[in-house]
Regions:
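Structural preference for beta-strand elements that scaffold enzyme active sites
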Residues: 2-6, 35, 89-93, 116-119, ...
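A short acidic, amphipathic alpha-helical/loop segment
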Residues: 105-106, 231
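Acidic-and-aromatic substrate-binding clefts and catalytic sites of carbohydrate-active enzymes
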Residues: 13-19, 97-104, 216-224, 248
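Domain-core and long-helix interface of multi-subunit machines
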Residues: 112-235
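Positions that flank functional sites
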Residues: 43-44, 174, 215-216, 247-248
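An N-terminally biased module of ancient metal coordination in phosphate/nucleic-acid-related enzymes
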Residues: 1-100, 110, 176-178, 182-188, ...
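Short acidic/histidine-rich active-site segments
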Residues: 41, 170, 237-248
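Short, conserved acidic/polar surface loops in the N-terminal third of protein domains
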Residues: 48-49, 101-105, 129-132
């Protein structure tokens, strides 16, 4: 008998999502999911509206501004819906992006007692665009590798901070570098720091996410792929979640 769970989903409270909390819960029940979480975006570096940051054109991902409003609103809506929900193991969640880029805000969200589940994600390096927006074909390959080095370094610091339940989509940039742009990347130069990321998570009793969004995209593989999942397990990791990263 198959047990299906989905621990990474978004609603219209995410700027790039659609639908209501109630619609998501109804669909999860219809699918017979054994566990289900809504994890709307809370990209901490976009806490305020664009004008707060001086130059609203500085970063391309303008839709994400204002997370200080839409993320708490998602938590409220989820919590209220859960009070009269039956027949579904539902976890009120959030996807906490770039927490160390606004640590005060991240601490505030992470301490919300209504939350059952926090995904810690890293979508963009400090002062850079989301990996989704970067023009890799216009860059020297060494620049791409430098971005990835900073990516894993900042991810490690987030894991050391530790106010998360699972690490989201470890290999997120490959969705765009390899999947969309067709640029092949060898992650071997980052083996040591990835091991350190996993060991940090394991020491803190945290898990990793298998984000299956890559299977329905050009990348064609989960994030991370099986090799990294096996490494996490070999190092002593025991906590895995699976998430569709659905935005509707």
């Amino acid at each position: 008998m198959k047990t299906l769970i989905d621990m990474h989903t978004h609603t219209g409270f995410s700027p790039d999502g659609e639908g209501t909390v109630e619609q998501s819960l109804a669909k999860a029940k219809e699918l017979g999911l054994a566990a289900f979480a809504i994890t709307d975006h809370c990209d901490c570096n976009f806490r305020y509206k664009a004008d707060h940051y001086g130059d609203p054109e500085a970063l391309k991902d303008g839709m994400m501004y204002g997370s200080g409003e839409y993320a708490p609103a998602s938590i409220v809506a989820q919590y209220e819906a859960a009070q009269h929900l039956e027949g579904l193991n539902f976890l009120c969640g959030i996807e906490l992006g770039q927490p160390l880029q606004d640590i005060e805000f991240a601490e505030e969200i992470a301490s919300d007692k209504r939350l059952d589940f926090i995904i810690g994600s890293h979508h963009q390096n400090k002062g850079k665009d989301d990996f989704y927006w970067i023009e890799y074909k216009n860059m020297d390959l060494s620049q791409t590798y430098a971005l990835l080095e900073d990516y894993f370094k900042e991810m490690l610091e987030m894991c050391k901070w530790g106010k998360l339940d699972v690490l989201g989509h470890l290999t997120y940039p490959l969705r765009y570098i390899q999947g969309d742009c067709g640029i092949q990347i060898d992650l071997a130069p980052y083996d040591e720091i990835i091991r350190e990321i996993f060991c940090t998570l394991i020491q803190k009793g945290k898990g990793i996410e298998i984000n299956v969004s890559g299977l329905r995209q050009k990348y064609g593989k989960p994030l991370p792929d099986l090799g990294f999942v096996k490494l996490y397990k070999a190092l002593g990791g025991e906590i895995l979640t699976i998430g569709s990263d659905a935005h509707c």
